[in-house]
Amino acid sequence: MQSINQYVWIIPLLPCLTAVILGLGLISTKNATKSQRLGSAILSIGALLVTMLLSITVLWEQVISDSAYRQLVSWIKVDNLFLEIGCLVDPLSAIMLVLVTTVGVLVMIYTHGYMSHDQGYVRFFAYLSLFTASMLGLVLSPNLVQVYAFWELVGMCSYLLVGFWFTRPSAAYACQKAFITNRVGDFGLLLGILALYWLTGSLEFDIVASRAHQLLVENSANTVLLTVCCVLLFLGPIAKSAQFPLHVWLPDAMEGPTPISALIHAATMVAAGVYLVARLLPLFQEVPLVMDIVAWTGGITAVLGATVALAQKDLKKGLAYSTMSQLGYMILALGVGSYQAGLFHLITHAYSKALLFLGSGSVIHGIEPVVGYNPNQSQNMTYMGGLRSYMPITGVTFLIGTLSLCGVPPFACFWSKDEILADAWHKLPVLGLLAWLTAGLTAFYMFRMYFITFEGTFRGSSLISNKSSKQTLSVNKMDSVFALSNQTKDNTSLKASKHLDPHESSNAMTIPLIVLTIPTILIGFIGAPLPNGLTGSSLLSHWLYLDNTEIVELSTNGWTEFAITALPSVSIGILGAFIAWIVYGPHVDRLKNNPVSIDPSAEGWTGILLNSIYNWSLRRAYIDEIYDQTFVWATRSSANALAWFDQWTIDGIVNVGGLFTLLGGEGTRYTESGRTSAYIFVLGIGLVFVMIAAVLFNFFHL
């Protein structure tokens, strides 16, 4: 029986062909009929379902064989330049294949319900299929050249999907911001690839690290140059995985449809940066300074994302900053050498965050008939509350995702996050402390989102009613959701409202939510400690490991030691959730002058401190404002100066030359009298001037 690995190239090909077919259909048909829309969904979901089954087969063969497979084809061979393309199948790529396809299938099913009334329904499925093909091609790439090609395709798909509703100015701005910010990282990645090839003469993942090690041992390579090369390579993951300081594009990318937020900006594309760091980890470990840079970048990003998420009012943007923080956890783990923990958290977080994003989409879809289709209202948690009674499936599944992300046992993210904390404490205690504090912040802001959205009373109807009667409650000027609750607590009865009630989403949207709860609950057990008597610490550690690298592992003496190790992370998570319940629980209507809000009457150092933290979080740590006042302002000023120079200098010279030519032509036109005698007279005058010039040149010996 032939190995399935020989046909692994079919995996990215199927969704690619689907995208081509749908694209040709869009070109040939202006307005898709109902049957064509349904056909595009069936084709996209069916192709990706087959791809998912193939990916699961590849993963199973990797598990039982425990051997990598590589298939290469010569692409370019010119003198000393020899490049190949092909497929690389190992435990890392096999896991990513299953991750992308399983989440992708559920997102496409969800999309059928979420985008059912959108005019761009077929176009959306075409973009989804193209992105899936690009992502699958990226994880199967055996070298950096092929990675870069698919890396750019993934970025292009993100641009198209973030700006899917391009007639909306905010969406058009968001896709440009995402594209330009990622170009900074991609340029660094390209320079790093070129420098690495110049140093090692190869771009194959399994060769560059060994050659770099050999060059360092033989003192044939400059350590500084190799460090710069690795840092340039790391710029690509910094931008793609929304790490500080190139993270600013991710929250704005929430302008795209919610299924995209779940697939691209939570589970797959943003994880591509983590994947590339994992691939390059043997190379990075040759330079300890680079590992420290990676670790500190992840640690700072984790804390920054968590603090900024504390006061966000937009549900999707709050989840975006949460994603940024969790990606920081993964980068931190890889930076301290914990290869398994970083990738383990990538897996658990992908399913949990996909569940949360799809749940947020269900919430938005359910309240839009009540509050309107403006995202400033339908995504604003201020307009929500009490939705668990109207949307029970969405509420329960969102709570499961929240429990997982907060690290509550036995949900998936508990196992991976706890392993990261333990390894960080062991290698860099300062970063371990930051990661531990981030765990508490994560529990606080996630339960804050849950309580504001699903508990209490629904506030949307009363707000819309007050707006329609010109008694507008300005959300932008509200100090917090508490002030909003205090002002609307006497007018939140849905029965008296003339508006529709929030409603649960269709089966096409709720079934993926229910299915995603299964891995959110169970998949963490693949990394759970094994009972005494078995070697190793988990099932995952027997299979997903990195050769020739220092992996931080703690001794495993059973569940007792594990429970003691996990106690600090669970404790601070419970503390964060408890504080969120006190501040944002169902009883918030009874609270007055809550110090967490921006209360003008707040006095003392406590009020000043809390208000400063609130402003820091609400205004995104002022980073976007700083960038606008520096890089954006400088770029626009330079562009305006160049435009002025082009208009008045470059164009001015050309225009003046044209003006003189015009005047000369007009003047010459009047000498055209048609008389031969006049022409002879002018010719004679010219000859006289020529003779005078010749005499002068001869006399003065010029």
UniProtKB/Swiss-Prot annotation:
Disulfide bonds: none annotated. It is a multi-pass membrane protein. It catalyses: a plastoquinone + NADH + (n+1) H(+)(in) = a plastoquinol + NAD(+) + n H(+)(out); a plastoquinone + NADPH + (n+1) H(+)(in) = a plastoquinol + NADP(+) + n H(+)(out). It comes from the Eukaryota. Keywords: Chloroplast, Membrane, NAD, NADP, Plastid, Plastoquinone, Quinone, Thylakoid, Translocase, Transmembrane, Transmembrane helix, Transport. Signal peptide: none annotated. It is found in: Plastid, Chloroplast thylakoid membrane. Gene3D superfamilies: 1.20.5.2700. GO terms for molecular function: NADH dehydrogenase (ubiquinone) activity; quinone binding. Its EC number is 7.1.1.-. It is an enzyme of class 7 (translocase). The chain crosses the membrane at residues 7-27, 40-60, 91-111, 124-144, 147-167, 189-209, 224-244, 258-278, 289-309, 327-347, 354-374, 395-415, 427-447, 511-531, 562-582, 680-700. Belongs to the complex I subunit 5 family. NDH is composed of at least 16 different subunits, 5 of which are encoded in the nucleus. NDH shuttles electrons from NAD(P)H:plastoquinone, via FMN and iron-sulfur (Fe-S) centers, to quinones in the photosynthetic chain and possibly in a chloroplast respiratory chain. The immediate electron acceptor for the enzyme in this species is believed to be plastoquinone. Couples the redox reaction to proton translocation, and thus conserves the redox energy in a proton gradient. NCBIfam families: NDH_I_L (TIGR01974), PRK06590.1 (NF005141). PANTHER family: NADH-UBIQUINONE OXIDOREDUCTASE CHAIN 5 (PTHR42829:SF2). This is NAD(P)H-quinone oxidoreductase subunit 5, chloroplastic.
